[in-house]
Amino acid sequence: MRAKEFINEVPLPPDWDPEKLNLRQTFKDRLKYALDRAKRLGGGSSRVAMTIDYEGRPTALKVAKNAKGLAQNEAEIEILDDGYLGNLPIIIPLIDYDKANKRPVWLQTEIAKKIQAPTLMKLLHTPSLSLFTNKVRNIMGQQKRFDANDEQLKAEYFKTSNDRWKPTEQDWGMFNEYANEVADLVSQSKLELDDLRNPANWGVYNNRPVIIDLGFTSDTKQYYGYMG
Protein backbone atom coordinates (compact mmCIF):
# COMPACT_ATOMS: atom_id res chain seq x y z
CA MET A 1 0.00 0.00 0.00
CA ARG A 2 1.29 3.43 -0.91
CA ALA A 3 1.71 5.82 2.01
CA LYS A 4 -0.47 8.55 0.47
CA GLU A 5 -3.44 6.17 0.30
CA PHE A 6 -4.01 6.44 4.03
CA ILE A 7 -2.20 9.59 5.19
CA ASN A 8 -4.09 12.84 4.84
CA GLU A 9 -2.02 15.11 7.04
CA VAL A 10 1.29 14.25 8.64
CA PRO A 11 2.88 17.06 10.64
CA LEU A 12 6.56 17.77 10.99
CA PRO A 13 8.08 16.46 14.23
CA PRO A 14 6.02 17.88 17.13
CA ASP A 15 8.96 19.80 18.58
CA TRP A 16 9.51 21.75 15.33
CA ASP A 17 8.18 25.31 15.08
CA PRO A 18 6.34 25.73 11.74
CA GLU A 19 6.98 29.47 11.89
CA LYS A 20 10.69 28.80 11.46
CA LEU A 21 9.99 27.24 8.06
CA ASN A 22 7.60 29.79 6.61
CA LEU A 23 8.35 32.06 3.68
CA ARG A 24 8.94 35.06 5.93
CA GLN A 25 12.23 33.46 6.96
CA THR A 26 15.29 33.52 4.72
CA PHE A 27 16.36 30.41 2.84
CA LYS A 28 19.48 30.30 4.99
CA ASP A 29 17.58 30.51 8.27
CA ARG A 30 15.00 27.90 7.26
CA LEU A 31 17.71 25.50 6.21
CA LYS A 32 19.73 26.05 9.36
CA TYR A 33 16.67 25.42 11.53
CA ALA A 34 15.97 22.11 9.80
CA LEU A 35 19.58 20.92 9.75
CA ASP A 36 19.96 21.70 13.45
CA ARG A 37 17.25 19.10 14.05
CA ALA A 38 17.71 16.51 11.32
CA LYS A 39 20.55 14.46 9.86
CA ARG A 40 21.63 15.51 6.39
CA LEU A 41 21.24 12.86 3.67
CA GLY A 42 22.56 14.81 0.73
CA GLY A 43 21.64 17.63 -1.56
CA GLY A 44 22.25 19.54 -4.72
CA SER A 45 22.21 23.10 -5.97
CA SER A 46 18.57 23.67 -5.06
CA ARG A 47 17.51 21.44 -2.17
CA VAL A 48 18.92 19.65 0.85
CA ALA A 49 17.63 16.22 1.85
CA MET A 50 17.62 15.12 5.46
CA THR A 51 16.06 12.35 7.50
CA ILE A 52 13.30 12.68 10.10
CA ASP A 53 11.50 9.91 11.95
CA TYR A 54 7.85 9.16 11.30
CA GLU A 55 6.02 6.34 13.07
CA GLY A 56 9.30 4.81 14.15
CA ARG A 57 10.95 4.75 10.73
CA PRO A 58 13.26 7.18 8.95
CA THR A 59 11.76 9.27 6.16
CA ALA A 60 13.23 11.85 3.78
CA LEU A 61 12.61 15.59 4.10
CA LYS A 62 13.60 17.88 1.22
CA VAL A 63 13.99 21.57 2.03
CA ALA A 64 14.40 24.25 -0.64
CA LYS A 65 17.60 26.29 -0.43
CA ASN A 66 16.69 28.83 -3.15
CA ALA A 67 13.98 29.75 -5.67
CA LYS A 68 14.99 26.82 -7.85
CA GLY A 69 14.34 24.51 -4.92
CA LEU A 70 10.85 25.93 -4.43
CA ALA A 71 10.14 25.33 -8.12
CA GLN A 72 11.45 21.78 -7.85
CA ASN A 73 9.27 21.12 -4.82
CA GLU A 74 6.23 22.38 -6.73
CA ALA A 75 7.05 20.21 -9.74
CA GLU A 76 7.68 17.14 -7.61
CA ILE A 77 4.52 17.57 -5.56
CA GLU A 78 2.47 17.96 -8.75
CA ILE A 79 3.49 14.41 -9.63
CA LEU A 80 3.67 12.77 -6.21
CA ASP A 81 0.33 14.15 -5.02
CA ASP A 82 -1.51 13.16 -8.20
CA GLY A 83 -4.15 10.52 -7.59
CA TYR A 84 -2.86 8.31 -10.40
CA LEU A 85 0.80 9.20 -10.89
CA GLY A 86 1.47 9.27 -7.15
CA ASN A 87 0.56 5.61 -6.89
CA LEU A 88 2.81 4.38 -9.69
CA PRO A 89 5.32 1.87 -8.26
CA ILE A 90 8.21 3.46 -10.16
CA ILE A 91 8.27 6.57 -7.91
CA ILE A 92 9.00 7.06 -4.22
CA PRO A 93 5.78 7.48 -2.17
CA LEU A 94 4.85 10.90 -0.84
CA ILE A 95 4.07 11.25 2.86
CA ASP A 96 3.39 14.96 3.31
CA TYR A 97 4.29 18.41 2.02
CA ASP A 98 4.18 22.05 3.06
CA LYS A 99 0.60 23.30 2.75
CA ALA A 100 1.02 26.31 5.03
CA ASN A 101 3.00 28.43 2.59
CA LYS A 102 2.04 29.76 -0.83
CA ARG A 103 5.04 27.90 -2.25
CA PRO A 104 6.10 24.61 -0.61
CA VAL A 105 9.29 25.01 1.39
CA TRP A 106 9.53 21.28 2.11
CA LEU A 107 8.17 17.88 1.19
CA GLN A 108 8.43 14.51 2.92
CA THR A 109 8.69 11.10 1.26
CA GLU A 110 9.59 7.57 2.16
CA ILE A 111 13.32 7.02 2.16
CA ALA A 112 15.13 5.04 -0.52
CA LYS A 113 18.58 3.52 -0.51
CA LYS A 114 21.01 5.33 -2.79
CA ILE A 115 22.48 3.36 -5.68
CA GLN A 116 25.23 3.70 -8.27
CA ALA A 117 24.90 3.18 -12.03
CA PRO A 118 25.91 -0.53 -12.12
CA THR A 119 23.30 -1.44 -9.50
CA LEU A 120 20.61 0.66 -11.17
CA MET A 121 21.24 -0.98 -14.54
CA LYS A 122 21.06 -4.40 -12.93
CA LEU A 123 17.75 -3.56 -11.26
CA LEU A 124 16.30 -2.17 -14.49
CA HIS A 125 17.63 -5.21 -16.38
CA THR A 126 19.40 -3.02 -18.92
CA PRO A 127 22.96 -2.95 -20.30
CA SER A 128 22.88 0.87 -20.36
CA LEU A 129 20.66 3.73 -19.25
CA SER A 130 20.71 5.20 -22.75
CA LEU A 131 19.23 1.98 -24.14
CA PHE A 132 16.58 2.10 -21.43
CA THR A 133 15.52 5.67 -22.24
CA ASN A 134 15.57 4.78 -25.95
CA LYS A 135 13.01 2.05 -25.19
CA VAL A 136 10.88 4.48 -23.19
CA ARG A 137 10.82 6.92 -26.12
CA ASN A 138 9.82 4.09 -28.45
CA ILE A 139 6.89 3.22 -26.20
CA MET A 140 5.77 6.87 -26.14
CA GLY A 141 6.22 7.25 -29.89
CA GLN A 142 8.81 9.98 -29.41
CA GLN A 143 11.90 8.51 -31.03
CA LYS A 144 14.88 10.76 -31.63
CA ARG A 145 16.70 10.83 -34.95
CA PHE A 146 19.38 8.30 -34.01
CA ASP A 147 17.29 6.07 -31.73
CA ALA A 148 17.08 2.36 -32.45
CA ASN A 149 13.68 1.01 -33.43
CA ASP A 150 12.25 -1.89 -31.40
CA GLU A 151 13.81 -4.58 -33.59
CA GLN A 152 17.23 -2.92 -33.52
CA LEU A 153 16.94 -2.25 -29.82
CA LYS A 154 16.22 -5.89 -28.98
CA ALA A 155 19.15 -7.00 -31.12
CA GLU A 156 21.41 -4.55 -29.30
CA TYR A 157 20.03 -5.71 -25.95
CA PHE A 158 21.07 -9.31 -26.53
CA LYS A 159 24.22 -8.43 -28.46
CA THR A 160 25.98 -7.28 -25.31
CA SER A 161 27.14 -10.27 -23.28
CA ASN A 162 29.99 -10.57 -20.82
CA ASP A 163 30.71 -11.82 -17.33
CA ARG A 164 28.59 -9.05 -15.83
CA TRP A 165 25.76 -9.06 -18.36
CA LYS A 166 24.21 -12.23 -19.78
CA PRO A 167 20.65 -11.27 -20.70
CA THR A 168 17.79 -13.76 -20.80
CA GLU A 169 14.24 -13.51 -22.11
CA GLN A 170 13.15 -12.97 -18.51
CA ASP A 171 15.52 -9.99 -18.29
CA TRP A 172 14.04 -8.64 -21.51
CA GLY A 173 10.56 -8.94 -20.03
CA MET A 174 11.52 -7.06 -16.87
CA PHE A 175 13.32 -4.42 -18.94
CA ASN A 176 10.12 -3.82 -20.89
CA GLU A 177 8.01 -3.75 -17.73
CA TYR A 178 10.09 -1.01 -16.15
CA ALA A 179 10.29 0.92 -19.43
CA ASN A 180 6.49 0.85 -19.67
CA GLU A 181 6.17 2.15 -16.10
CA VAL A 182 8.49 5.06 -16.85
CA ALA A 183 6.73 5.77 -20.16
CA ASP A 184 3.41 5.90 -18.31
CA LEU A 185 4.86 8.41 -15.85
CA VAL A 186 6.65 10.65 -18.35
CA SER A 187 3.82 10.71 -20.89
CA GLN A 188 1.36 11.96 -18.26
CA SER A 189 3.60 14.49 -16.55
CA LYS A 190 6.11 17.22 -17.39
CA LEU A 191 9.06 15.14 -16.21
CA GLU A 192 12.12 15.27 -18.47
CA LEU A 193 13.07 11.72 -19.51
CA ASP A 194 16.74 12.41 -20.15
CA ASP A 195 17.17 13.43 -16.52
CA LEU A 196 16.45 9.83 -15.55
CA ARG A 197 19.76 8.76 -17.07
CA ASN A 198 21.36 10.19 -13.93
CA PRO A 199 21.63 7.42 -11.29
CA ALA A 200 21.46 10.07 -8.55
CA ASN A 201 17.76 10.47 -9.36
CA TRP A 202 17.08 6.83 -8.49
CA GLY A 203 17.04 4.73 -5.35
CA VAL A 204 15.83 1.38 -4.04
CA TYR A 205 12.59 1.15 -2.08
CA ASN A 206 10.92 -2.14 -1.15
CA ASN A 207 13.57 -3.99 -3.17
CA ARG A 208 12.77 -2.28 -6.46
CA PRO A 209 14.10 0.75 -8.34
CA VAL A 210 12.22 4.00 -7.82
CA ILE A 211 12.67 7.57 -9.00
CA ILE A 212 13.45 9.77 -6.00
CA ASP A 213 13.97 13.14 -7.72
CA LEU A 214 11.16 14.35 -9.97
CA GLY A 215 11.98 18.04 -9.84
CA PHE A 216 13.42 18.48 -13.34
CA THR A 217 10.46 19.17 -15.61
CA SER A 218 9.60 21.29 -18.63
CA ASP A 219 8.48 23.96 -16.13
CA THR A 220 11.72 24.04 -14.13
CA LYS A 221 14.13 23.96 -17.08
CA GLN A 222 14.41 27.73 -16.96
CA TYR A 223 16.24 27.48 -13.65
CA TYR A 224 18.96 25.38 -15.26
CA GLY A 225 19.79 27.76 -18.09
CA TYR A 226 17.93 25.78 -20.78
CA MET A 227 16.56 27.79 -23.65
CA GLY A 228 13.47 27.09 -25.70
Q: What is the predicted role of each segment?
A:
Residues 11-56:
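ATP-binding glycine-rich phosphate-binding loop
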Residues 1-10:
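Short acidic, low-complexity intrinsically disordered linear motifs used
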Residues 88-175:
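Conserved structural core of kinase catalytic domains
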